[in-house]
Amino acid sequence: MKRNLFLSVLFVLMFAPAHAQQVNILSYNVHNCIGMDKEYNYRRIANVISQTSPDIVALQELDSVTVRNKGIHALGELEKLTGMHGTYAAAIPFQGGSYGIGILSREIPIKYKIIPMPGREEKRTLIIAEFKDYVFCATHQSLTPEDQLLAVPLIEKALQNVDKPIFMAGDMN
């Protein structure tokens, strides 16, 4: 019930009246760029992204300069391999670096902000990136329904003065 309410509120926020336009959106939980074969493979992830030809991508579970991924900034690798522009938000410090979410976009954002989100099991974040014709939000929501509900007014407040179409994508758990 609470999850349905959360999703309903997000639906209303995302589909406010707007001018018709097409934006190809991909949401991809990349699991630290580790495949089912337990190997880090940034090219494999980049190929999946490129094959879908998105305008914008919400990425979850990105390592940035951690021991686990041998000091590589995963989003930076994906930027190089896809030719897209990256925006990163650390959610938690992790193994000498950080772990978080990101956006890959064809356009460079005009501006962006990072909003902390509730997360009992680990801290969560929301990236709000403004582009010429729209605003894009990327997130990786908490596993707990209570935290998901607590996130709704934070998202609503952060977007209350936006006068462009708003799109939101991510791992909503």
List the model feature ranges, each with a label.
Residues L5-L13:
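Sec-dependent signal peptide hydrophobic core
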Residues Q22-I34, K113, I128-S142:
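Active-site-proximal beta-strand elements of phosphoester/diester hydrolases
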Residues H31, D63, S142, M172-N173:
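Catalytic metal-binding/acid-base residues of hydrolase active sites
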Residues C137-I155:
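Active-site-proximal segments of metal-dependent phosphoesterases and phosphodiesterases across multiple
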Residues L150-N173:
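Metal-dependent phosphoesterases centered on the DNase I-like endonuclease/exonuclease/phosphatase
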